[in-house]
Amino acid sequence: MSNYKFETLQLHVGQEQADPATDSRAVPIYQTTSYVFRNSQHAADRFGLADAGNIYGRLTNSTQDVFEKRIAALEGGVAALATASGAAAITYTIEALAQAGDDIVAQKTIYGGSYNLLEHTLTQFGVTTTFVNAHDLAEVENAIQPNTKAVYLETLGNPNSDIPDIDAIAAIAHKHGLPLVIDNTFGTPYLIRPIEHGADIVVHSATKFIGGHGTTLGGIIVDSGKFDWKASGKFGNIADPNPSYHGVSFADAAGPAAFVTYIRAILLRDTGATISPFNAFLLLQGTETLSLRIERHVENTKKVVEFLANHPQVEKVNHPSLPDHPDHALYEKYFPNGGASIFTFNIKGGRKEAFKFIDNLKIFSLLANVADVKSLVIHPASTTHSQLNDEELAEQQIYQNTIRLSIGTEHIDDIIADLEAGFAAVRGE
């Protein structure tokens, strides 16, 4: 279906015809743990990767398979692997690339959970991270050492929606024989497809825009199929015979889909962060309206940014659509149709004023999720990024007066009226 447009692909990929078992037009929920093999040789072929298909529910499921194929198509990849959460997708990606003694080069301004994973959790297993200012290309390249295994970015940083120069950083990574990993959770494939800009692996928290309704946890890893694992010489676990899977070379057995096949066959098999069939089904429902929702998110965001930028109680709006934002040129290059409906602003005052503003909103829900059809708000310094010390917070331009907004799809007049009510409460009105 590669000739179809995005809006058609999001509805049909993975189930081009009615379900063969039931004639169902909707993708069924295959609620099963295991699958019957036709005979012993069929079972052996499945386990040996000679025959593609279901083996066990921890590894594959037919509902999950449709979801994986659909997101892979939307991102322009060759294959995908769904996981139980976005955190699992990111963790598996790094674990597949780096082992004890290895290092990752990562953008400083990323989601707090990802920062904590790289800075603290993975160091317990001997994997370190060198955090860099992604806007300083010389700093990015100088951070690459012989033990570096990947470069890690976000298309839109969390929470400030800062934008790296993906094309330039991809060129640096590939010059050194390294894959570029990009978290496209905030960008979405409707607004930007990182593989077209040189990304080798794309990850998502599907909980966010893909699901879109705040109901379902899930993650997904998309393999571009473009990275040559053998030529790199740095990834023996993928390119060489793997003793934990009876000597299979995943590069040989799975070809362009080697990366996600390795994760499925080894990491998912051994640690089991499997997406449930029901969650895969719900995420498919979200995928089918992705383009429609994103258009409304973007439309509303433009108007909210304009409102905040001209408000006397706002110290600063951190949104790349503004001409004075340092990433404005990159925003116009990579997001010609708009984006960044999750962003921050600094209210005049400090923590007290930020809390007062947040606590007096009615439509905006105070919670730790983003990218919901409902508008959301949070104070990052005391919640999502509270594990960072003061220096780390300052490096990410998160202060006690910083407020993160996730703009939903409500009527724009109601959104702006709610924000104004928050400001009025701060004024004591």
Located regions from the model:
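Short hydrophobic/aromatic beta-strand micro-patches
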Residues: 222, 344-346, 406-408
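Active-site beta-loop-alpha junctions enriched in small/polar residues
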Residues: 156, 185-187, 322, 348, ...
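Conserved PLP-enzyme active-site core in the AAT-like
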Residues: 2, 14, 18, 80-310
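Glycine-centered tight turns that cap/initiate beta-strands
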Residues: 76, 147, 313-316, 363, ...
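Short conserved active-site loop signatures built around small residues
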Residues: 1-30, 221
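Conserved small-domain helix->loop->beta segment predominantly found in fold-type I
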Residues: 271-274, 278-280, 285-289, 294-296, ...
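Conserved N-terminal alpha-helix of the aminotransferase class I/II PLP-enzyme fold
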Residues: 39-88, 113-120
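PLP-dependent enzyme catalytic core of the Aspartate aminotransferase-like
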Residues: 119, 128, 146, 293, ...
